[in-house]
Amino acid sequence: MRRLRLSSMMLAFLLTVIVSAAAQEVVKLPAPKTEGGMPLMQALKERKSGREFSSQKLPLPVLSNLLWAAWGINRPDGHHTAPSARNAQDIDVYVAMSDGLFLYEPKENQLQKISADDIRAATGTNDYVKDAALNLVYVADLKKANMKEPDADFYIGADTAFLAQNAYLFCASEGLQVVVRGSIDRPALAKLMKLRPEQKITLAQSVGYPKK
């Protein structure tokens, strides 16, 4: 009986290790293509919101380019494609896809797997969010921001908007459907994302190919 109990405990431990290892999976992204694309003025002309998505996934090179456009590093000193107040770099970009939730790590140009669960439907209150290839979830780190309210809310809102507009312009250049959203059950989503108390969801943005 004791041997059986020990075997059960060992099996439970191994399963925990396996699940933990799966959650810590890292996806290395291809180097972003930082030249070419649609001219800026044309991308501004084409920029729009769309809410009808096909189920087609984004290829890794396109995903890499999207994330770099939104919040990639574009200078040797570690600065980003979008500004941030006091250079706090306080916004994290999470990517919710059918194969799990990932954290974009711009310095390493990689995705850190947070969960294997498909939480796309929980990233907003609109039905279409579950159909988009991915949903970007912008999360502010209040500890990094190091500001008191209401200044913190103002600046993290502005910082998030810069990232979202970068993503909009990339999607216009690439012919992707995109819409930024504020209608989110933030407490429920934060729990699914395993966020820390000092992390605050600001906006989400659905991205994918247009429905044909």
Walk through the language-model features, giving the residues of each.
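Short secondary-structure transition/capping segments
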Residues: 190-194
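Bacterial N-terminal signal peptides that target proteins for export
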Residues: 1-10
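A glycine-rich helix N-cap at a beta->alpha junction
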Residues: 195-212
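Generic beta-structure capping elements
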Residues: 32, 139-141, 208-210
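Bacterial N-terminal signal peptides
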Residues: 9-18
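N-terminal amphipathic, basic helical "cap/leader" segment at the start of enzyme domains
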Residues: 22-132
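Small-aliphatic-rich amphipathic alpha-helix that forms the alpha element of a beta-alpha
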Residues: 47, 66, 93, 134-189
